[in-house]
Structures are given as structure tokens and as C-alpha cells.
């Protein structure tokens, strides 16, 4: 509710939409993320938040219609990620990592210690300890490659990618590596990315997360409303990076040539019908 109240306050305080220059108002209803992580997407708690957001968005649309008319604004609605269902609720093929995976990863640490005479190679997940690398006189890329081979043999691991591999840039024919590379930043990302088998939730205990390149962690809604948009549900593939070029096209704003994504054909009838 506070996010919606902030939207009304911003509309008034900054006179958004009062002239011919497009104004951008971006809202994030992040409560659903916190609830979803704790209780899962199929829980009554998540449903309660979704219904509340639906009401708040409906009220906001009514206010925008009142202020600017139905053709006086463009609106987009999406999410930044999907989510893995709670295995305890939906069952197979979804399952949670357990002692088998933990023991194997602990074995990787022991093997690296046996090879290089040092313990505690990983900090904060799959990031190699730079101080330990310097002490041992080893390069991160070489140790990461060793660790990747060891981790790839663990149960439930589909694939392991190193930071060096991602930095070189995967090809379009490798969709998993391509998806992971879009979340990779050399200065901030770990040295290893573990891609777990489909359905395996890499989280101990309770709750859920979105830490894979599988469709359930990536699929999000993409809704566009406004003048020039033909109503209907479209079946063709789209990506979240298409949203900015689409909004720009609807608003008549030029798009730089190097922007990722493409304007979606929202002005055409869905599926040609």
C-alpha cells in the first residue's frame, strides 16, 4: 500500500504527465518477492499479496484514466525473475539439495586443500579467496578450472561455468551459458557458476529462490497497455530486454542502436488474427 501511496504523491509533487515530455514512473511491489521466498509461489500468503497488488494496480489505473484519459499514458507490467516451486508442495521432479550435495562440495574443498596445501578456498559461495590465492601463488582461473571439474562430478550438478568462460562470451548456440552470462559482471560475480539439474532447488532448510537458468526461474509476465496497443495475448517469444524499446516506440522516443532487445509488434493483432 505504501508503494501505491508513493505513486500518487509523486504524480502530484512532480506534476507528472503535465506537459508533452514523457515522464517515467517506475514502481516495485517488492513485498511479493519477500513472501515468495519464504512461503513459495503457490502459498496462500503469496496469493494474498497478489490479490492486494491487483487491487492497488487497478486503483492506480483508474486514477490514471481520470487524470489523463485511457489514451493518455503507456503502462508496462513485468517481473525481474521467476521462482522455483517449493518441492514440499509440488513434488517430483522438484526436490531440495541435501546432505549428498553438501558432502560432495565439502569433498571438493578437501581435495583442493590436498592439492595446494591450504584450506578454505571458497568464500561467499563459489568465490575463491583472493588472499589465499596470493599466498599460494596461484591464479584464480587455474584453481577455478580445477574446482569446476570436481564440482561437475557432484550429484545434481548439470554443469559448472567459470568466470573466465563467461568473460570470453558464450555463443548463441549455448542458451544456458548465454542466460548465465547476462547475470555476470567480472568485478562482482563469483569465480564459478553452478547450474543445477532441472527441478533441484539449491537451498537448504525452508523457503525457495531463483538461482538457475531453467524456465521456471526465468519466465515472467510482460504486459503492455496504452494507445497503439492492440489487446490480446501473444504467443511469440519475447524477452524483458524488449520492454524498453517497445515503450520507446510507443512514446516516440528514439532508441540507441546498441540497446539490447527489439520493439515488440504490440500494434498488430496477436498471431495475425
Regions found by a protein language model. Give the residues of each.
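His/Asp/Glu-rich, glycine-adjacent segments
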Residues: 1-23, 30-37, 152-159
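Structural recognition of the beta-strand scaffold that forms the well-ordered cores
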Residues: 23-28, 74-77, 160, 193-195, ...
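Surface-exposed acidic, glycine-flexible loop patches that form ligand/cofactor-binding
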Residues: 11-20, 65-69, 182-185, 213, ...
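Extracytoplasmic/secreted cell-surface and envelope-processing proteins
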Residues: 35-37, 84-88, 203-205, 232-234
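Substrate-binding rim/cap in mid-to-C-terminal beta-strand-loop elements of soluble/periplasmic
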Residues: 92, 99-141, 205, 209-251, ...
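Active-site His/acidic residue clusters
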Residues: 15-53, 59, 90-91
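Secreted, luminal/periplasmic, and some membrane-associated catalytic domains
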Residues: 44, 55, 59-200
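Solvent-exposed, polar/charged alpha-helical surfaces in well-ordered, non-transmembrane soluble domains
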Residues: 5-9, 51, 55-58, 62, ...
